[in-house]
Amino acid sequence: DGECIFGQHSAAQTHLEGQGVGLGDVFVFFGLFAEEETGEPHHRIFGYLRVEEMIPLAGGAPADLVALRHPHALAMHSANDVIWRGEGRTAKRAGESLRLTVPGGPPSLWKRPEWLKRGGLSYHDREDRWLHGKRLRSVARGQEFVADIGRRQAPREWLARVIDEIKAS
């Protein structure tokens, strides 16, 4: 229906708070997939959420989220359990532009947009992660990587293309 409801808690939520993630920001979700023809594992972007509302659950979950049976609304996972809510969708098909893993590479070896440089993605500060040829060796664990794009035009255009691809699928 065009709405995304995402729950987060514990260290991951603390990281998001520490990075200043909030209203108006956009989550870009990725996961591990397998190519249909070859079974090749790879990371791929599969959805997004434009944050319109942040709902701390420490004071109780809103009735509409309980009625939807959202896992974070049914039972608190930790003291800092939060629901992130807003416009969002998942991709219906796997367009090549949403693939993160370089062709033929291990899942953790990503192609990266030109605008994304060392120091621009949380958890990826080590120099050896930023490789020639616009590649990034992604950390093996984690899911909340924050890129503060500010008002820069190139990352905003990249994000718009990703969202357009998801909506068009």
Residue locations for each model-derived region?
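Contiguous surface segments at macromolecular interaction interfaces
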Residues: 54-169
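Short beta-strand-centered aromatic/proline hotspots
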Residues: 38-55
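Short N-terminal edge-element motif at the start of the domain
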Residues: 1-42
